[in-house]
Amino acid sequence: MSCNRFFLIGLLVLGSITSGAKPNFVIILSDDMGYSDIGCFGGEIQTPNLDSLAKDGLRFSQFYNAARCCPTRASLLSGLYQHQAGIGLMTGDKKLPGYQGELGRNILTIAEALGLAGYQNYMSGKWHVTKHTRPEGPKENWPRQRGFDRFYGTITGAGSFYDPATLCRDNTYITPANDSDYQPETYYYTDAISDNAVRFLKDHEMSDAEKPFFLYLAYTTAHWPMHALPRDIKKYQGMYDGGFDPIRKARLKKLKAMGLVSSDTKLSPGSDNWEKTPHKEWEIRNMETYAAMVDNMDQGIGRVIKELRNQDKFKDTLFLYLQDNGGCAEGYGRYAAKNGYREDQPMEPDELQKKIWPPMQTRDGRPLRVGPGEMAGPEDTFIGYGRGWANVSNTPFREYKHFAHEGGIATPLIAHWTKGIAKKMRGKIDHQPGHLIDLMATF
């Protein structure tokens, strides 16, 4: 079966575009989220905008990624398997074919291909397909050199949501403080990704409205650290007080009712026993914060949708939402800091944040707080939500990010395109397997 038959069947694209007009494309990629986190895939987290896209679009129940950040992005951007694209693992060079840790220069990215077809290409968010992350470069594998006309985001893969490492506008390192183009009252990276995407769309409408566009919206939600705004955390207070199992059972029941999994599907073995889990209040707060991060991302997706509706381009736009891997069981920040851990010095507001892994102090000199009892959410914390909640995120599957089990590689896929999906197909679920390499072939 050809690699694009999957979408030609599912989306019923042929014959749906009048007058040969080219559709716009929006790919939304979230980070370190599980199969059943969002509402339209069984989750209790409030994601009304993604749910709306699913209601009037298509859901794919057996779509697969590459289990890690970099390989998934390399495959998505190239339409190739990750080893063919040069990033079989992460961005370290293993001195082996397929493991160069760098997006191959002999491949055409989706943005480069669409540019040749007359598209304007925009990216907001996480890049993570090059080992060259320093401000001095080399930059031949940065977004602007791989087909994107404008870029706002981070070159590397993780960091504070209040002070992102490797933050750039186009080819220039910036900080939240010295970026004259974007000065919100409170800087939060997920909001910044959404807001800059909306700005790109506004500017496109003013200067290039006659051209189709491709927007790659690559969130770092919900990669550790668990950073979220208080107003979003408040929505989820009390929701997770019962621990892991009640949420897993409720999600599986909803997945079955929706028809996303078969009626005889069983839960995978639980990874942690809630009754024996210490620091329950801390664990609850970690998941409340995680849910708040996802909620905030959905709010931003809503702003993108609203802008396209205002421009009367929503119906002409194909939206695809998916995730880079499963929920993450890594234990980052879940243990108390050792002596000598906080060794960095405070930074000036406009001093470039070059450190890939987090500094041990905030810019204003507050020590970073990690370990049990340090409640997630604020800027001066740096905590992962842990194995127990990752098991919840990946309901009903076993294992996590990193693994080639369903818990590591199964992703929701939502496709929405008012002019391209027949009315009789809207709201339906497609159970045919698909993979990242199918996306570029479809475009």
Task: Give short role names for the model-derived ranges.
Residues F6-G15:
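Sec-dependent N-terminal signal peptides
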